[in-house]
């Protein structure tokens, strides 16, 4: 580290270095192969993982690529450097391909969910699944901020989302078993924890509201005392006119927390975090209900955390 250079500066520089390497590799490959941006990311990641140019390009292009890869060959990147750089690259891909990405989960929420998991799961290891994983960024954020050994699973019904999740997982050296399928057809059992960011869903007449159907299905995948932490729209319960969803959920589960999130985090509807445990409490514990301030308001945010800490201490979850 140079004189006057902070650890934060080094981390930021490493993140930029990794991003620039991927980006320049994609540019070189585009000039040679004219593939779409996600395909370019896949080729670049495969080259980096192989520590060699394994895609079909001529020697001149291979030499240019190797010069880029040499820039990162001996750098000790943190998992967060790699994750953040890849998330920025993937977001650029969404923009290049003109794909809406309004449901991208802010990193701060992944970190906050990791905190909630640490309060709910005391064991040193756990099985963890995101059945609506998208690019996998929220899942990887959670894993990176959990001081636990994770057996991780992910699912999405979009081929490229599963590919991107797998690519990032491989770069991070974090094993994640990824499924390409409808989340309602998953048959995992005895999971310790399920996390998700529910996509914005319009309620269709005479059809069951997808988030209700999904959450009831996910609850069947949890082990006894397992937990589910999901981000949902704040009007989530408004569609449960006859309380049918709530009655079905509460047969085997308890809602133990509801966290209202800052509006500034989302470009569309405001959202909340729903915390569910697959356990029925005889004393019918009240759930914790917290309205989070902006994450940049450290004093008020810490006050909200103290409320949650006090609830867990009182209720011995």
Q: PLM features: what roles do these ranges have?
A:
Residues 268-317:
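Flexible, glycine-/basic-rich loop-and-beta segments that form/coincide
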Residues 158-188:
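S-adenosyl-L-methionine
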Residues 208-270:
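Conserved Class I SAM-dependent methyltransferase catalytic core
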Residues 107-125:
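Conserved alpha-helix/loop element of class I SAM-dependent methyltransferases that forms part
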Residues 123-134:
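Conserved class I S-adenosyl-L-methionine
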Residues 1-93:
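A short N-terminal interaction module
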Residues 151-156:
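Conserved SAM-binding motif I beta-strand of class I
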Residues 135-148:
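Conserved SAM-binding loop of SAM-dependent methyltransferases across substrates and taxa
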């Amino acid at each position: 580290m140079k004189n006057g250079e902070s650890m934060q500066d080094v981390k930021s520089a490493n993140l930029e270095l990794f991003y620039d390497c991927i980006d320049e590799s994609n540019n070189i490959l585009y000039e040679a192969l004219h593939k779409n941006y996600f395909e370019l990311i896949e080729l670049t990641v495969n080259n980096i993982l192989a520590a060699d140019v394994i895609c079909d390009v001529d020697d001149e292009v291979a030499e240019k690529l190797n010069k880029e890869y040499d820039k990162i060959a001996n750098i000790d990147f943190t998992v967060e450097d790699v994750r953040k750089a890849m998330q920025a690259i993937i977001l650029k891909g969404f923009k290049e391909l003109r794909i809406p990405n309004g449901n991208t989960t802010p990193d701060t929420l992944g970190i906050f969910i990791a905190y909630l998991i640490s309060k709910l799961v005391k064991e040193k290891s756990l099985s963890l699944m995101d059945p609506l994983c998208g690019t996998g960024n929220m899942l990887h954020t959670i894993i990176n901020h959990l001081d636990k050994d994770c057996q991780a699973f992910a699912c999405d019904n979009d081929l490229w989302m599963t590919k991107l999740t797998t690519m990032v997982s491989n770069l991070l050296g974090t094993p994640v078993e990824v499924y390409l399928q409808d989340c309602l057809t998953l048959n995992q059992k005895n999971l310790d924890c399920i996390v998700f960011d529910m996509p914005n869903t319009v309620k269709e007449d005479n059809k069951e509201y997808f988030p209700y159907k999904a959450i009831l299905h996910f609850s069947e995948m949890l082990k006894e005392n397992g937990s589910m932490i999901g981000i949902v729209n704040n009007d989530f319960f408004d569609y449960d006119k006859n309380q049918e969803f709530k009655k079905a959920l509460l047969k085997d589960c308890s809602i133990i927390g509801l966290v209202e999130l800052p509006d500034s985090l989302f470009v569309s509807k405001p959202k909340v975090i729903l915390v569910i445990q697959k356990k029925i409490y005889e004393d019918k514990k009240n759930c914790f209900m917290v309205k989070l301030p902006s994450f940049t308001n450290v004093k008020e945010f810490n006050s909200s955390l103290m409320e949650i800490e006090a609830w867990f201490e009182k209720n011995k979850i």
